[in-house]
């Protein structure tokens, strides 16, 4: 998509923040309007995260107008809202390539631009990193400002509060901006509150505030009276007591779509000392009515026609694995009142919408709090219930200690339904589910299952749900199922694989949903094909049998080779002193960039042609 100068005449003048700061302030509302329209035009043609960026246009313009970026350092949390930032920082003409192979990264990325101070993708990291960056800037002595932008979802995570607690203790010079994009502008946002925010953020108020503290510090009753008076005055118009108690000077809430007001407030706050907190209210999906009405649906979008006001409907093909899980969850809950389902803010993505509506008293969305989700599940299990934690592979990493300390050591029957396992695609390095088999396999008493299709996935979910001797995990990929027939639910024998095809000389031991590719390769090479099903416990007997009957073995998985299922097979063979050659095929030792799942598998040699080529080269 080429940039249309006639359509966006003001935006055409801005290809860097230096050019932005040369614009007269009066032209900035027009720039915001063009930037929002350009974002709509670009993302609707290319796909990507959408509603969040529409809500941060004015904030982004104001930040880059007031602060001397990239010298001053701007940190975006998660990064869904950073598309306008990318457009204003030299990447305007490439925004149509975002999330595509070889295109712009879906999130702020240090290797892509000097304006991207912190590489992100997971939530709630900005304030912690910002404190470190602010401390480094102070020691550097170059008067460099630090600003963190965090959303109302990300700030609910414990890590954000840990960071703010630390900031209140060491008091670095930094600004945290809370982008609060609830469904409506707060009743406190208006002319009076914006005017008050500018007064409270000014140097005069700050000087009087700090000077008063020093003068009356030796007179405890008066000091306490002043504190209470200030809190009372602020409390009449702002909800900032919590952040004040953490040691921040709180300002807000203010209208996040008033670019001129934001500029005034930011200029006032730019030179204040110590940790500052600015609370802004924005509208997710701002400027595009369908996204304003349904920001969840328009959070991330495929290519669509903006004039239609709706996203393209599914082709009605095969259900996704998330839907398979959601259907199983509802079916099981209808039979067993002990089932409790937990998700860390991933209801839609994990296929739990129907469950949340049918069983609201047994559905728990704990927000972006993976650690809490796991230990909460442990408590439910102790109380005699049957918790199912639905979580993406990449986010389960954030609760690793809780899986070990709070669940596995106590042998609690918590089942982890691990979605987005393996290659995820367009969200790139931060979201690939590359490591779960490796980091779970080493945990004692953990049962790990890898279904080869949707029917086996259902059976494994049932098996894990009814396993009472410790935690279980069923991992399945992003994307559509394979269209196999669904059979009645029945428990599988723990730790037992299944031979799918008998061949000669070579045996392929497959773990998971690469089975269709493995079947093609087995047919081409006349190899034995085994659906291993369990990563832990491994079917040692079957592995040794395959080793005895074949000249070589190949393991296949969509997980990191290091420490994965193939490593487990190697360990079994070494423990029994079996000198059979083994080729481990899986994800290589680097972080996999964005692109479609098909592109990534082809490039990594995990499609049928690539797997066959790897095996032939190894056997040659």
UniProtKB/Swiss-Prot annotation:
Annotated GO CC locations: cytosol
Catalytic reactions on record: D-glyceraldehyde 3-phosphate + pyruvate + H(+) = 1-deoxy-D-xylulose 5-phosphate + CO2
Gene3D superfamilies tied to this protein: 3.40.50.920, 3.40.50.970
Free-text cofactor note: Binds 1 Mg(2+) ion per subunit.
Cofactor: Mg(2+); thiamine diphosphate
GO molecular function: 1-deoxy-D-xylulose-5-phosphate synthase activity; magnesium ion binding; thiamine pyrophosphate binding
Domain of life assignment: Bacteria
EC numbers for this chain: 2.2.1.7
A Pfam match: Transketolase_C
Residue positions binding thiamine diphosphate: 80, 121-123, 153-154, 181, 288, 370
Transmembrane stretches, start-end: none
Keywords of the record: Isoprene biosynthesis, Magnesium, Metal-binding, Thiamine biosynthesis, Thiamine pyrophosphate, Transferase
GO biological process: 1-deoxy-D-xylulose 5-phosphate biosynthetic process; isopentenyl diphosphate biosynthetic process, methylerythritol 4-phosphate pathway; terpenoid biosynthetic process; thiamine biosynthetic process
Family label: Belongs to the transketolase family. DXPS subfamily.
Subunit (UniProt): Homodimer.
Function: Catalyzes the acyloin condensation reaction between C atoms 2 and 3 of pyruvate and glyceraldehyde 3-phosphate to yield 1-deoxy-D-xylulose-5-phosphate (DXP).
Protein name in the entry: 1-deoxy-D-xylulose-5-phosphate synthase
């Amino acid at each position: 998509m080429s940039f249309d100068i006639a359509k966006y005449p003001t935006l055409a003048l801005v290809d860097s923040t230096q050019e932005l700061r040369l614009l007269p302030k009066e032209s900035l509302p027009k720039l915001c309007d063009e930037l929002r329209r350009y974002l709509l035009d670009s993302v609707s043609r290319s796909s990507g995260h959408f509603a969040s960026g529409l809500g941060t246009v004015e904030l982004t313009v104001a930040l880059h107008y007031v602060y001397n970026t990239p010298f001053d350092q701007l940190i975006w949390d998660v990064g869904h809202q950073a598309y306008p930032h990318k457009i204003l920082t030299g990447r305007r003409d490439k925004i149509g390539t975002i999330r595509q192979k070889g295109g712009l990264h879906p999130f702020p990325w240090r290797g892509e631009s000097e304006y991207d101070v912190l590489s992100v993708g997971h939530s709630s990291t900005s304030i912690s990193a910002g404190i470190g960056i602010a401390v480094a800037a102070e020691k550097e002595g170059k008067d460099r400002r630090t600003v963190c932008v965090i959303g109302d979802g990300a700030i609910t995570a414990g890590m954000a509060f840990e960071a703010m607690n630390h900031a209140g203790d060491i008091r670095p010079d930094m600004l945290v901006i809370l982008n609060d994009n609830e469904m409506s502008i707060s009743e406190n946002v208006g002319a009076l509150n914006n005017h008050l925010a500018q007064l409270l953020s000014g140097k005069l108020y700050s000087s009087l505030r700090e000077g008063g503290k020093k003068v009356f510090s030796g007179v405890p009753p008066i000091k306490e009276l002043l504190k209470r008076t200030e809190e009372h005055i602020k409390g009449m118009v702002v909800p900032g007591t919590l952040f004040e108690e953490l040691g921040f000077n709180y300002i807000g809430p203010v209208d996040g779509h008033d670019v001129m007001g934001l500029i005034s407030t930011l200029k006032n706050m730019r030179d204040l000392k110590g940790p500052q907190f600015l609370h802004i209210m924005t509208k997710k999906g701002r400027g595009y009515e369908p996204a304003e009405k349904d920001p969840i649906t328009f959070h991330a979008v495929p290519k669509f026609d903006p004039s239609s006001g709706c996203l393209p409907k599914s082709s009605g093909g095969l259900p996704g694995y998330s839907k398979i899980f959601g259907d199983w969850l509802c079916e099981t809950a209808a039979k067993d009142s002990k089932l409790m389902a937990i998700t860390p803010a991933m209801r839609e993505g994990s296929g739990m919408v129907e469950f949340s509506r049918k069983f609201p008293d047994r559905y728990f969305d704990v927000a972006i709090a993976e650690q809490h989700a796991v230990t909460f599940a442990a408590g439910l299990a102790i109380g005699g219930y049957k918790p199912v934690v639905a979580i993406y592979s990449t986010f389960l990493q954030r609760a690793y200690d809780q899986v070990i300390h709070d669940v596995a050591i106590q042998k609690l029957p918590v089942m982890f339904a691990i979605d987005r396992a393996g290659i995820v695609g367009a969200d790139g390095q931060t979201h690939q589910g590359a490591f779960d088999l490796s980091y779970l396999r080493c945990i004692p008493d953990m049962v790990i299952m890898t279904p080869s299709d949707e029917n086996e996935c259902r059976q494994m979910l049932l098996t894990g749900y009814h396993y009472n001797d410790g935690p279980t995990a069923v991992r399945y990929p992003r994307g559509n199922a394979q269209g196999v027939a669904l059979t009645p639910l029945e428990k599988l024998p723990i730790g037992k694989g299944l031979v799918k095809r008998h061949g000669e000389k070579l045996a392929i031991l497959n773990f998971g949903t690469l089975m269709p590719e493995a079947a093609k390769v087995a047919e081409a090479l006349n190899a034995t094909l085994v659906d291993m099903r369990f990563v832990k416990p491994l079917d040692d007997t079957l592995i040794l049998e395959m080793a005895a009957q074949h000249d070589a073995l190949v393991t296949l998985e969509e997980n990191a080779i290091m420490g994965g299922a193939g490593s487990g097979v190697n360990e079994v063979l070494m423990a029994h002193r079996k000198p059979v050659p083994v080729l481990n095929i899986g994800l290589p030792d680097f972080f996999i960039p964005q692109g479609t799942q098909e592109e990534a598998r082809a490039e990594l040699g995990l499609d049928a042609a690539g797997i066959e080529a790897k095996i032939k080269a190894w056997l040659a």
